[in-house]
Regions:
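Metal-associated gating/positioning segment near the N- to mid-region
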Residues: 49-113
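N-terminal metal-binding scaffold of metallo-dependent hydrolase/deaminase domains
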Residues: 1-40
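Short, acidic/polar
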Residues: 71-79, 131-141
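Divalent metal-coordination and catalytic microenvironments
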Residues: 8, 23, 28, 50, ...
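Acidic (Asp/Glu)-rich catalytic clusters
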Residues: 109-116, 139-144
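Active-site metal-binding motif and surrounding structural segment of the metallo-beta-lactamase
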Residues: 37-53
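Active-site-proximal beta-alpha core segment in soluble small-molecule metabolic enzymes
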Residues: 102-103, 108, 123, 129-136
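Divalent metal-dependent hydrolysis catalytic cores, especially in the metallo-beta-lactamase
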Residues: 77-100, 117-129, 143-155
Length: 155
């Protein structure tokens, strides 16, 4: 699919751009900014006037309700809300209920997130079992399951 995003305020820190620009996308990749490539025919045109066009945002502390508190919110609803706000990746602290202190829980979370295919989820593993501050978790196993770092949130 070829997409033309027009009239949007492009903010691209990597390339030092903060200006109204058109963006041209083909096969999911940005192929041009400003002027269209030769023979570019968009199958979809998005008028982004009054909107910001930028790289995906990363939220470093998303308090997930899953596992354990799905009656409040599901991974799907929380990921949908994040993506609607421009967040494409997020880290989730271990203070869920139950805490992210078991490899099986982390694997389940990563598997569900991958199947939803909305945003990248980076679990933060519990530093101690049950977040009680007494015994360390099996950090190597948690890392193998997908934890990127470990933490001990204040209770």
């Amino acid at each position: 699919m070829k997409i033309h995003i027009k009239n949007g305020r492009l903010i691209d820190p990597k390339n030092g751009i903060d200006a109204v620009r058109d963006v041209f996308i083909a096969k999911g990749k940005i192929i041009a900014i400003g002027m269209p490539p030769d023979e570019f025919q968009a199958s979809r045109i998005i008028d982004a006037q009054s909107f910001i066009v930028c790289p995906g945002l990363v939220d470093l502390s998303v308090r997930l309700r899953e596992p354990g508190l799905e009656y409040k919110a599901t991974l799907e609803s929380e990921m949908g809300a994040a993506v609607a706000g421009g967040v494409t990746s997020f880290a989730c602290p271990p203070d869920t209920d139950p805490p992210l202190d078991e490899p099986g829980l982390v694997e389940m979370l990563k598997h569900r997130a991958k199947n939803l295919n909305q945003a990248h989820v980076y679990p933060i593993g519990a530093l101690t079992q049950g977040l009680r501050g007494e015994r360390l978790t099996e950090m190597a196993e948690l890392n193998d399951a997908g934890c990127i770092v470990f933490g001990q949130p204040d209770g």
